[in-house]
Each structure stands twice: as C-alpha cells, then as structure tokens.
C-alpha cells in the first residue's frame, strides 16, 4: 500500500498535520514509535499543567481565610496528584487516537527510518509515499557538566513520568521549563534553587516581565541565582551537591534532586539512511518557506527544524500550513504571530514584538501599561498585582506586541495575538465591549491606556 503523505512523529505537529492532510483528501499514514501526543501531551505541556493546577488549588486552600472560609489540616498527596496527571494524559491521548481513526489516518507503530524520497522503513516493512513530513520533535539537551549522569539528576521527562516529590530541588536553567517547575515545587513547600547562566531568568522574554517574576519568586522563597555557571554535580553525604561560579565566587547548593532544564535538541539521530543528506545543522533540519528540505519530497516541521520556535502550537500551525500547500491550498495559519506562555502564579504570556525588539528594528514604538490590580475580577479573586504592557507604533497606533503578567494571562494573550495578526490599532481593540466583571476587561483597558482614555486607571 502507498500513501500520498507519510508523517513521521505523532506529537502536536505530526498528528495535526496528519488529520488536516486527511481532511484535505490526502491518503495519509502516521508513524509513531511511542504513544501519540509526543512530548507535549505525554511528558511536557499537559502533565506539567495538570500538576501546576493541583498545586495552585493547594495554595488557594491554604489562603481561603481571605474569603471567609476555613480549611484545617490542608495537605497534599503527590502520588495522587501524579495519578490524576496520568489520567488527564491518558484521556487526551485516547482522544487523539480516536481523531486519527475517525479521520481515516493509517496509524503505524514503530521507529521510522527514511531510505530516500518516498520510502520509509518501519521494522521489516518499507512504506511508500509521494511525500514525507518529518515531525520528529525534540528531547532534553544536557550541557557538558561533570556529574549529570548521577542518580537524582533528572530531566523534565523524568519528573513528569515519576511520582517522587523532592523536598529540596536545584534547577539548572531559568527558562520556561525551569521556572514552571520552580513555581510548582515552591507551591508545595519545597526548597527551590534556580541556577541561570545568563544575567536574568527567562532571558528571551521582555526584561520587565522577567524582573517582575524574579521579585515575586524571591518573595515566595525561591532562591534565584543569575549569572551562575554550574561547574559540577557530586554525590554528598546529605544529597547532591551542585557547585557553581557566580561573580568570581564558587558556591554550592545541596539538593535531593537536580533538574536539568537547559534547552532541547532535535530528535534526528538515526532518522535517515546515510545516503539521505538533509544537511543537518547541529542536528536540526534546514527548510524553506514551504517546509521543504534539501531533498525533494521530504518536508519537516516543529522542534526538529532549524530555528523553529519549540512550542506545540507553533508545530501544529506549521503542520497545517505544510500539508495545505501540499494539497494545493493557500496556507491558512499566520506563523508570524506565535504567543508564548509561562504557567507560574501569576501567569505570564507574550506575543509579538517587545519594546526592545521594536527599537532594534527601527520602529517608532510607544508602550502603554495597565495595572490589573484595578480590575474588578482581579480584586474579587484576590489575584494580586499584575500588569499588561502593550507595544504599538507611535505613528499609526498599530499594535505590535503585548506582555502580560497577571491572572489568566495565558487566556488573555489570544486576544492580542488576534489583534496583531489582523493589523489592528489601539482604537480597534478599545472598540470591543467586554463583559463585566471579567479578567478580559483588562485587555480593553490596556488599549485605552495607550490612547490616554483608561477609565479605571489614572492616565499619565
């Protein structure tokens, strides 16, 4: 049997591409060696958020006296939390399997090896197809630090498939993965230390967002060490000893476990036969604007692509565009606007350009800020301080980017993503009526702040 498209990898990019290809009339096969859903569903986004949601409910129970409620003897059962995590993952994974079957995608289990254009080996069988789409994803990358092979040195994969809770956790890397685990473990009462090599946590995000979260984390008791270069990890009498250099001094932290969250690398090892040269660059696959590799008929999307944004929703959008073009359709997704989120408390989200990026591009940029502490729903829920900062063109008022640190930021950022994609101005955004009292009102207020017309905040 032959197919018009063979998709390698069943993560968000791969299964989305396979389903859309089938919807567009292409005979499609999906090859996945493990469970469908990839890292995101099985060992990433979904299990992390399931645990974070539980930890936040635990925090809220301890703070319930604010609302006139009393809850005595509040505790948590981490094994039970992990059991629910696994139930959530299983439910969503089963849903993906049903969608693949319902859309008549042929699901093939096994490890794929590309033998050449149109030929993929899976076990003893050789599949034939008109086109091949690689959606192989990525895996945790470990830096060359002595001692990272010791028991108790873990990756996010390890933490999200086990059910052991560590009272002392050292985290190497202050990016999104590192900070989400820091927030999770802090909420459950652990001693958390974050070691970030650069000068601030979340270095790819807006500096004000990064600095604000840093202050909040420190206030909650998380030890943050920026500019820290980890030199080695050793087994000590009381746990793992992580030695790091900061400001010409050598310091140590002792922990029950060390999480290495220093980035990810493409899953391309052994993907192709030697005669199939995709021109890999540090393991990543170069592609053109149609996601075509240097080999005709072989395409690639998602984390395995050189320079790609390593986000599940970005991979899914790339997959939709790639197969749409293969089917002779116009690509429907705007890949220039990709929101990113950090699930901490309060939540963080970013989309479009930051003020600094606008200035680097020579844009006459202005910013407006709305403090969410004056939002009615935020006061009702005791959400605390937060803000929304909007970057816009100082001449036209066109919205260029938004940075959010507030309750429900990960939901609110979608409205800004839509506005940026459509080329909307502050006036366009301010024209929309939001229900009251809602967190979403803050979006309109942020736009009004840029116009100098905010109602619930003094205009400056």
Give a label for each model feature.
Residues 47, 120, 266, 293, ...:
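Hydrophobic "anchor" residues
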Residues 8-13, 17-34, 39, 46, ...:
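Flexible, glycine-rich terminal cap/loop adjacent to redox cofactors
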Residues 1-3, 123-131, 248-257, 294:
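Core beta-strand elements of the Rossmann-like FAD/NAD(P) dinucleotide-binding domain
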Residues 149-167, 252-325:
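FAD-site-proximal beta/loop scaffold in flavoenzymes
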Residues 163-205:
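Rossmann-like NAD(P)H-binding beta-loop-alpha module
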Residues 2-3, 19-26, 31-165, 193, ...:
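Glycine-rich flavin
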Residues 106-109, 113-121, 188-289, 353, ...:
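A Rossmann-like FAD-binding core segment of flavoenzymes
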């Amino acid at each position: 049997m032959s197919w018009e498209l063979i998709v390698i990898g069943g993560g968000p990019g791969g299964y989305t591409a396979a389903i859309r290809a089938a919807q567009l009339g292409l005979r499609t096969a999906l090859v996945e060696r493990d469970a469908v859903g990839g890292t995101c569903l099985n060992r990433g986004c979904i299990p992390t958020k399931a645990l974070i949601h539980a930890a936040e409910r635990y925090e809220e129970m301890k703070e319930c006296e604010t609302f006139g409620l009393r809850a005595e003897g509040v505790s948590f059962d981490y094994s039970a939390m992990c059991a629910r995590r696994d139930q959530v993952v299983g439910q969503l994974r089963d849903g993906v399997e049903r969608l693949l079957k319902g859309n008549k995608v042929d699901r093939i289990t096994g490890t794929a090896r590309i033998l050449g254009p149109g030929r993929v080996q899976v076990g003893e069988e050789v599949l034939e197809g008109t086109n091949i789409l690689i959606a192989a994803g990525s895996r945790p990358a470990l830096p060359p630090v002595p001692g990272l092979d010791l028991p108790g040195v873990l990756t996010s994969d390890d933490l999200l498939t086990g059910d052991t809770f560590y009272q002392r956790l050292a985290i190497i890397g202050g990016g999104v993965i590192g900070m989400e685990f820091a927030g999770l473990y802090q909420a459950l009462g652990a001693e958390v230390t974050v070691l970030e090599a650069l000068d601030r946590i979340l270095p790819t995000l807006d500096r004000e967002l990064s600095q604000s979260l840093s202050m909040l984390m420190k206030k909650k008791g998380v030890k943050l060490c920026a500019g820290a270069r980890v030199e080695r990890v050793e087994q000590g009498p009381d746990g793992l000893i992580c030695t790091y250099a900061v400001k010409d001094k050598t310091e140590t932290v002792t922990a029950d476990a060390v999480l290495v969250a220093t980035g990810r690398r493409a899953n391309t090892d052994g993907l192709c036969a030697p005669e199939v040269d995709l021109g890999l660059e540090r393991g990543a696959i170069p592609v053109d604007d149609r996601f075509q590799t240097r080999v005709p008929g072989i395409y690639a999307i998602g984390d395995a692509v050189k320079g790609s944004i390593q986000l599940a929703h970005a991979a899914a959008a790339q997959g939709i565009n790639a197969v749409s073009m293969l089917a002779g359709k116009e690509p429907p997704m705007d890949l220039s606007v990709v929101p990113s989120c950090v699930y901490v408390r309060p939540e963080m989200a970013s989309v479009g350009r930051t003020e600094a990026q606008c200035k680097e591009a020579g844009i006459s940029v202005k910013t407006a800020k709305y403090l969410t502490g004056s939002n009615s729903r935020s006061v009702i829920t005791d959400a605390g301080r937060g803000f929304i900062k909007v970057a816009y063109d100082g001449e036209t008022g066109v919205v260029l980017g938004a940075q959010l640190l507030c309750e429900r930021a990960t939901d609110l950022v979608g409205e800004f993503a839509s506005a940026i994609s459509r080329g909307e101005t502050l006036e366009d955004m301010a024209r929309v009526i939001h229900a009251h009292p809602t967190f979403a009102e803050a979006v309109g207020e942020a736009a009004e702040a840029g116009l100098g017309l905010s109602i619930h905040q003094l205009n400056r």
